[in-house]
Design a protein with these regions (language model features):
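A domain-level signal for the structural core that forms small-molecule/cofactor-binding pockets
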Residues: 1-168
C-alpha cells in the first residue's frame, strides 16, 4: 500500500509545484489526507523511538509519545505547510499615507537545517496605497508563515513578500 506522503508528493510533482520545507502545500492535500499523514508520521516516529532503544510499551513517560509528536508536527509546528493562507480582507484607504505597524508579534518556527526551535519577536509594517488591512491580519499572516520549517532569513523574506501584496 502506498504511503499518503508518496501520493501527495506525486501530486505535487505532476503539478510541477515546488514542495520545499517552507512551502505551503495545502492546495494539494485533499480532505481526509492530513489525518492519514499524521498517522504516517506517528508510525515513522515510533520507528525513531524504537531505533533509539526506548521502551515505549513499558515506560509511562513515552507511551503515546509518537502520537503526540505527530500531532504536534502536522497540526502545530508545521501547520503553515498544510493549512490554507488566512483570508485577509483589505479596505479602501481613506487617505492614510504613513507607515502603520504591528508588534511585537511572537514567532515560533523551526530551523530547517537542524529542526531546532526558532523563537523570537518581530515588528511588521506597511505604507498603504489604495487599500489597508486590519492590524490583526499582520499577526495571522506572520504566524501562518512561521509555522513551517525554514531558515530565519527565508522566513523574513516570506513575511515581507506576503505583506507587500497588501501595500497597494
Amino acid at each position: 500500500m502506498e504511503k499518503i506522503s508518496e501520493i501527495i508528493r506525486m501530486r505535487l510533482k505532476e503539478a510541477g509545484v515546488r514542495y520545499n520545507s517552507n512551502d505551503n502545500i495545502s492546495e494539494y492535500v485533499k480532505e481526509g489526507e492530513l489525518e492519514k499523514l499524521q498517522q504516517e508520521v506517528q508510525d515513522q516516529f515510533q520507528t525513531v523511538l524504537d531505533s533509539l532503544v526506548i521502551d515505549t510499551a513499558n515506560d509511562h513517560n513515552t507511551q503515546e509519545t509518537a502520537k503526540r509528536v505527530a500531532k504536534m508536527y502536522v497540526q502545530e509546528i508545521f501547520g503553515g505547510r498544510f493549512q490554507p493562507t488566512p483570508r485577509v480582507t483589505a479596505f479602501p484607504n481613506m487617505g492614510y499615507k504613513s507607515m502603520y505597524t504591528s508588534g511585537p508579534i511572537s514567532i515560533r518556527s523551526t530551523c530547517a537545517h537542524h529542526f531546532q526551535n526558532i523563537v523570537g519577536k518581530c515588528w511588521v509594517g506597511i505604507i498603504p496605497e489604495d487599500e489597508v488591512i486590519g492590524l490583526s491580519k499582520f499577526n495571522r499572516l506572520v504566524h501562518h508563515i512561521a509555522e513551517r520549517p525554514q531558515i530565519q532569513e527565508e522566513m523574513t523574506s516570506a513575511i515581507a513578500d506576503r505583506l507587500s501584496l497588501f501595500a497597494k
